[in-house]
Amino acid sequence: MLTLLINILQDIKEVSLEKIATALPIPILFESRRKKIQRFLSLPIFNMSALWFPIIKNWHSQTFSANQTIHLVIDRTIWERKNLIIISIIYEQRAIPVYFEFLSKLGSSNFTEQTSVISKVLPLFKNEQLLLLGDR
């Protein structure tokens, strides 16, 4: 199923559950295809530490030299009415997302939320010189 979804994403070039469900070549109703995709993507194996962290770790080891300072940015933003706190790596004047969490409240993040998010990312950069940037 994962290979099929990746092929569909490459073909339709959009990340929309409805568009993926429409393109999914399974002879069942549209709503059933949509629910099947939702259930599949909700499996516990699909989490940041199992899927995304190995990709970031591999990219980091290939991209940065051993004694290079890694610039991390912590930011809070609103995305489609969801309050997010994000940690990103700065690379070639771009912020590459490393980890994010949805906040259960509106408004700014507090120190506890920030340290919780940072603590999940730090193991990716063992023995690295880090510079953490944030506002306020």
Map each language-model feature to its residues.
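Conserved, well-structured functional cores that handle cations and Mg-NTP chemistry
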Residues: 1-136
